[in-house]
Amino acid sequence: MGDSDELYERVAIHAERPGFRISEIRLTPTQQVPWHHHSNIQDTFYVLSGRIRITLRFPDEHIELGVGENWGPASARRPHRVSNAGTDTATFLVLQGMGDYDFVPETASS
């Protein structure tokens, strides 16, 4: 799949059991995971290729990660988005737990 307006180039769930999940997400340079939060789970990020930018609110925080770097956890209920911070496709893992998965969309001004 080439660069597009789709939210993600690719999403694959590598492991999922009650209360825990590992996802692989691929973003082209113009794509991002939109603003959202999770009711119960925390996100930890690990970059496989490219660069990503994690933007969080309450308090405002910006984290950039490259290959082999990780960050987390993003606390439950803390609004965040993830974007490609480079000019090449970025691929990263998201480890999520402990609790039931949900994705609660937010507006940029929430």
Model region roles, listed by residue range:
Residues 13-15, 33-39, 56, 63-64, ...:
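Short histidine-centered beta-strand/loop micro-motifs
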Residues 75-101:
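Ligand-binding loop in jelly-roll beta-barrel domains
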Residues 1-21, 34, 66-67, 103-110:
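A short, N-terminal "cap"/entry segment at the start of jelly-roll beta-barrel domains
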Residues 32-34, 50-55, 70-71:
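Short beta-strand segments in beta-sandwich/barrel cores
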Residues 26-27, 39-54, 95-97:
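Short, conserved beta-strand element in jelly-roll/cupin
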Residues 23-38, 76-77:
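Conserved short histidine dyad/triad with adjacent acidic residue
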Residues 59-77:
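Short acidic-glycine-tyrosine-enriched beta hairpin
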